[in-house]
């Protein structure tokens, strides 16, 4: 028995499912979850001492690679000054200045501890600001485990084939209108009926929790126009894409040049440099509705934690244009190699891209929405995953999650991935239901 198996068996005696986040249990791919003891650069090391090239990157935060020396030094210095004060610190202002300097759509910023808190607060703020109750979301878009946003969510719910979550009341669910992604006509129709009651539309800037799905040309801009016409707000969820796909997130890649601006944005992952930090920001007049001077309450003991702020500041300072250029180039290189390997084995597939994020869908030619994502041949992913794992490459343990690269993925790391792809493609081709 491996050390990971022993640890997992013990963990199941202590924690639900043996994990603290469902996808880690390897439920959709089978086998034993790897218990990670350390990470450095592009590599993870498990409890059995085996190393893996990491294509999860902590689900996005490790843009620079694991244990980046500048981030570690900043965290050490912050720890020496104290772990938590329950008071404001200079580091909060420094990180806020960096975010506002990168994302012109953000005029005010509020720090929280998780992406779920950020989206939950953004929804509450939209309702408070507009005086309306209804929220529009899109099937397959994941916005954390907020009660009102769990309907037809992607990520772990897609992995577990769950339509929603038990414990969400009918009254809560009734205030969420779920539409197909990339369908502006459906948005226009729902506003024609409910426009005066809709507080906000929330969407992932580029969905990455039903696999990666790029918004159709004009889709996000259309959402901005429709919400503005009806006095509703547009909430752009950049928890995953923010500062990961570019210096200003996905909106910086597309929205600024297309001439549309969201009212609120949410951030997480990279903004905390690997520590529990997230944020929401946007129009000053909307953000000022938050307490202490506004009527919409939000608070958190660990919001703006000084150690997390230090990690975020160090990460954003180190995330230069060269870093994004390098990650973009590696992403294009790997997605092309993945497609070639699958084509060589005659496996129908679609490599889905948005910025430097990508994923693979089996048995379909394109994924534009959640219905397409669910129609793929998911049974091919588990053998593909385990073949890569056996070759020392750690992929997301779900076909519905994005693949991530970092600035630490050098030629040696990339060559290990390339060498593993042909066998994994053969395993996918041989898979049966």
UniProtKB/Swiss-Prot annotation:
InterPro entries for the chain: 4pyrrol_synth_GluAld_NH2Trfase, Aminotrans_3, Aminotrans_3_PPA_site, PyrdxlP-dep_Trfase, PyrdxlP-dep_Trfase_major, PyrdxlP-dep_Trfase_small
Give the pathway annotation. Answer: Porphyrin-containing compound metabolism; protoporphyrin-IX biosynthesis; 5-aminolevulinate from L-glutamyl-tRNA(Glu): step 2/2
Name a GO molecular-function annotation. transaminase activity
> Which family, according to UniProt?
Belongs to the class-III pyridoxal-phosphate-dependent aminotransferase family. HemL subfamily.
Keyword tags: Cytoplasm, Isomerase, Porphyrin biosynthesis, Pyridoxal phosphate
Name the chemical reaction catalysed here: (S)-4-amino-5-oxopentanoate = 5-aminolevulinate
N6-(pyridoxal phosphate)lysine PTM positions: 269
- HAMAP family assigned: HemL_aminotrans_3
GO CC terms: cytoplasm
Q: Name one GO biological process term.
A: protoporphyrinogen IX biosynthetic process
Q: Which cofactor does it need?
A: pyridoxal 5'-phosphate
Q: Which PANTHER family match?
A: GLUTAMATE-1-SEMIALDEHYDE 2,1-AMINOMUTASE, GLUTAMATE-1-SEMIALDEHYDE 2,1-AMINOMUTASE 1, CHLOROPLASTIC-RELATED
Q: How does it assemble?
A: Homodimer.
Supply the enzyme class, top level: isomerase
UniProt KW Cytoplasm keyword: yes
Q: Which domain of life is it from?
A: Bacteria
Q: What is its main location?
A: cytoplasm
- Name its species: Renibacterium salmoninarum (strain ATCC 33209 / DSM 20767 / JCM 11484 / NBRC 15589 / NCIMB 2235)
Which named protein is this?
Glutamate-1-semialdehyde 2,1-aminomutase
């Amino acid at each position: 028995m491996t050390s990971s198996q022993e640890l997992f068996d013990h963990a199941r005696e202590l924690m639900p499912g043996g994990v603290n986040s469902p996808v880690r249990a390897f439920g959709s791919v089978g086998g034993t979850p790897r218990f990670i003891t350390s990470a450095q650069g592009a590599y993870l090391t498990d409890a059995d001492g085996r190393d893996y090239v990491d294509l999860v990157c902590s689900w996005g935060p490790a843009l620079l690679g694991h244990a980046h020396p500048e981030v570690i030094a900043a965290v050490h210095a912050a720890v020496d000054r104290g772990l938590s004060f329950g008071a404001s610190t200079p580091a909060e202002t420094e990180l806020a200045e960096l975010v506002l300097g990168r994302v012109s759509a953000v005029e005010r910023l509020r720090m929280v501890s998780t992406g779920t808190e950020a989206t939950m607060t953004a929804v509450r703020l939209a309702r408070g600001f507009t005086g309306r109750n209804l929220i529009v979301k899109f099937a397959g878009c994941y916005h954390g485990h907020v009660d009102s946003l769990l309907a037809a969510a992607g990520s772990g719910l897609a992995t577990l084939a769950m339509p929603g979550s038990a414990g969400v009341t009918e009254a809560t669910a009734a205030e969420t209108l779920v539409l197909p992604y990339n369908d502006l006509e459906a948005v226009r129709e729902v506003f024609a009926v409910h426009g005066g009651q809709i507080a906000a539309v929330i969407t992932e800037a580029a969905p990455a929790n039903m696999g990666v799905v790029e918004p159709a040309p004009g889709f996000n801009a259309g959402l901005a126009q429709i919400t503005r016409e009806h006095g509703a707000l547009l909430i752009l969820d950049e928890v995953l894409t923010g500062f990961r796909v570019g210096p200003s997130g996905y909106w910086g890649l597309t929205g600024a040049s297309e001439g549309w601006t969201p009212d609120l944005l949410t951030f997480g992952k990279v903004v905390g440099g690997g520590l529990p930090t997230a944020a929401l920001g946007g129009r000053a007049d909307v953000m000022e509705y938050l307490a202490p001077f506004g009527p919409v309450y939000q608070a958190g003991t660990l919001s703006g934690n000084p150690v997390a702020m230090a990690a975020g500041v160090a990460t954003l300072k180190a995330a230069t244009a060269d870093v994004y250029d390098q990650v973009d180039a590696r992403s294009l290189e790997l997605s092309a190699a993945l497609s070639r390997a699958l084509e060589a084995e005659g496996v129908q597939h679609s490599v889905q891209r948005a910025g430097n994020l990508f994923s693979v869908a089996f048995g379909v030619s394109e994924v534009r929405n959640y219905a397409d994502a669910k129609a793929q041949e998911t049974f091919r992913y588990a053998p593909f995953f385990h073949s890569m794992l056996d070759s020392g490459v750690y992929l997301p343990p779900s076909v519905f999650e994005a693949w991530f690269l970092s600035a630490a993925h050098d030629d040696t790391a990339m060559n290990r991935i390339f060498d593993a792809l042909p066998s994994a493609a053969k395993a996918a081709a041989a898979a049966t239901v």
